[in-house]
């Protein structure tokens, strides 16, 4: 993609758990990204992207900053965003379902909640 379109590539890593194997997998993938000059960043997400599930952010706590961007996703909400940013110190946060309106029996009322978005932004800026 990078060679043809000349756009930055962001690699995604799905974090499944907190075992030694998970930590080793994260370390190996991070090393691969750091060695790849075409990769602009790495996105850490939960084991099932889009499911709104968090993972143990402490697994990323000691990642050293480099010129690669660190993206954090997976179950972020206004309530946990400040702790996530404090623990991981990402360059970018990714939120979707965490700022949606509460479940409504009518699909016509689904969508993003402006108050939740405002609170989320306030909390990640702390």
Pin down the residues of each PLM region.
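Conserved anion-binding
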Residues: 1-73, 77-80
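Alpha-helix N-cap and loop-to-helix initiation/capping positions
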Residues: 21, 25, 55, 59, ...
């Amino acid at each position: 993609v990078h060679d043809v379109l000349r756009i930055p590539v962001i690699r995604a890593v799905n974090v499944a758990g907190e075992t030694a194997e998970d930590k080793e997998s994260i370390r190996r993938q991070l090393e691969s990204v750091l060695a790849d000059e075409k990769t602009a960043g790495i996105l850490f997400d939960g084991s099932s992207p889009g499911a709104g599930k968090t993972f143990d952010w402490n697994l990323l706590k000691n990642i050293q900053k480099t010129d690669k961007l660190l993206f954090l996703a997976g179950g972020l909400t206004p309530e946990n965003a400040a702790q996530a940013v404090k623990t991981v110190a990402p360059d970018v946060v990714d939120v979707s379902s965490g700022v949606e309106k509460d479940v409504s029996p009518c699909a016509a009322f689904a969508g993003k909640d402006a108050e939740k978005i405002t609170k989320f932004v306030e909390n990640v800026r702390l």
